[in-house]
Amino acid sequence: MATTLATDVRLSIAHQTRFALRLASTISSNPKSAASNAVFSPVSLHVALSLLAAGAGSATRDQLVATLGTGEVEGLHALAEQVVQFVLADASSAGGPHVAFANGVFVDASLPLKPSFQELAVCKYKADTQSVDFQTKAAEVATQVNSWVEKVTSGRIKDILPSGSVDNTTKLVLANALYFKGAWTDQFDSSGTKNDYFYLPDGSSVQTPFMSSMDDQYLSSSDGLKVLKLPYKQGGDKRQFSMYILLPEAPGGLSNLAEKLSAEPDFLERHIPRQRVALRQFKLPKFKISFETEASDLLKCLGLQLPFSNEADFSEMVDSPMAHGLRVSSVFHQAFVEVNEQGTEAAASTAIKMALLQARPPSVMDFIADHPFLFLLREDISGVVLFMGHVVNPLLSS
């Protein structure tokens, strides 16, 4: 049974990665998002939607499961349990990255949660379930949720629920928050950081600080793509977190890369670098990105329609005749990432209202990230993607 469960979880993680890549492709194809830097947390969205599926019935549940990519809802819960208890556990006391993650279910006092949903939320998702008063104290509840998220993300995400987004018609808010701060295994010497040109999608350029290093780096190069792996210091932690920079050789190749990642499920894994190589030149820009979106339309583009419609069925969530009137009205998502000489700080929050062989690379290579690129942060043992995004101009913070 343990072996079967492990196999099921590994399969679910592969589906989570596919979900992440489909999201990235959809964001990159949006003209507004493609023209600016973007970052999002696939795991934050995935866990929030999985918890939503736990309270959904019939066709609504089936559509959530299909969108998230697993064959059955139990696979979502098994994955969420592994993610929450293993992948996103804090490792700072062992010398590894500081990771903080929390789930919350805030339900109006007029709608008691079903015991089965509450037990699943608490045991599998480690969610804090709270009965609140949306009808007469909606603004206070919004402040409570925002303060909770701000605390978990060490102040990086302050207002996951925008002003006026919660009112006396709100019945339920599912929210989660994620924070990550890790130091590179091989930190960059800040004295080597110098301004250089970064070429923008429109052909113009800006001067921005580039980090550099003489150390050998994990790098692969094939199919018109270079992939850089930057491991984080782990200390005594058994997990291995890494950031990946996916640099298309063509300066305008970002959207094509995102499409290829989405269309070919094994494309990313095929290009993960397995060995260090000597670099003749190595330049990576520092960047800091804040990104927020109301993600309903994004999820609808992935085929998730029923939870937002009048046909939504959340009868497994609340013990009330009003359950059949519940639907998702908003999905607020915010993310933050900063990459500098020391390492990476990243945070995200979602609120739902309602071993392969590789050809050996050339002995000496260059890696100069002087045009738009994709990046992702993942835990390598499990393959879970925590953050993903793209940089089109390192000088832009949002």
UniProtKB/Swiss-Prot annotation:
Organism of provenance: Triticum aestivum (Wheat)
Listed name of the protein: Serpin-Z1C
Pfam families: Serpin
UniProt comment concerning the protein's domains: The reactive center loop (RCL) extends out from the body of the protein and directs binding to the target protease. The protease cleaves the serpin at the reactive site within the RCL, establishing a covalent linkage between the carboxyl group of the serpin reactive site and the serine hydroxyl of the protease. The resulting inactive serpin-protease complex is highly stable.
Lineage of source species: Eukaryota, Viridiplantae, Streptophyta, Embryophyta, Tracheophyta
Site (Reactive bond): 357-358
Region (RCL): 343-367
Keyword Electron transport assigned: no
Annotated InterPro entries: Serpin_CS, Serpin_dom, Serpin_fam, Serpin_sf, Serpin_sf_1, Serpin_sf_2
Keyword 4Fe-4S part of the UniProt annotation: no
Stored PROSITE patterns: SERPIN
Cystine residue pairs: none
Family: Belongs to the serpin family.
GO cellular component, one term: extracellular space
